[in-house]
Amino acid sequence: NSVAPMVQLIDNHFGVEQAYITTVHSYTKDQSLHDSPHKDLRRARAGALSIIPTTTGAAKALTKIFPHLEIGGCGMRVPVPNGSLTDVTFIVKKDCTIEEVNKVFLEASKGSHKNYVAYTEDPIVSVDVLGNSASCLFDSQLTSVLGKMVKVVCWYDNEMGYSNRLADLI
C-alpha cells in the first residue's frame, strides 16, 4: 500500500537496479500483549513491549507489479498501536541529489499521485500520521543519497490508508 508509489516514482525518474524495503509497523492483532505461544517464536513475544523482527510480504508483492526489479525486504513490529513507516533503500541507475528526489515526491503529491502520496517537511513521528488518508506520507527530512544509493521514508496510518484505497475501488 505505501511502498508501491515509492518504487514507481523512483524507478520512473532515476531507474532502479535493486531495492530493499524495511517496514516498521505497529504491532498487529496476531501478536499477544504478553509472551505466549505462537508458531513464530519472535511473534510469541510481547508485541506491546518489544521490537520484533519479522518478514514482510511487500517485497514479494512488488516483484509481481515490477517484475523487472530485484526487491528484498524485512519487517519490524514495534510497540505502538498505530502509525507505521516504510523505509526503502534503492540502488539507482542515474545520479541524483536529495533535492531532486524530494522534488519528485513533492510534485507527485500535487499531481499524478495526489490521492496516494502526501508530502511533509515537518519533523513528524508516528502519532502525527494517525488519520492521514494517504498511502504514503513522504518524509522529506529523512531522504538520503550516497552515490547511487537512495533512501526514502514514507509514513502511513495503515487502517486509514488501506480503507481509502478500498473506497477508491468503488
Please give the residue ranges for each predicted region.
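A generic structural signal for alpha-helix starts
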Residues: 1, 95-96, 160-161
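C-terminal substrate-binding/catalytic lobe of Rossmann-fold NAD(P)-dependent oxidoreductases
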Residues: 17-150
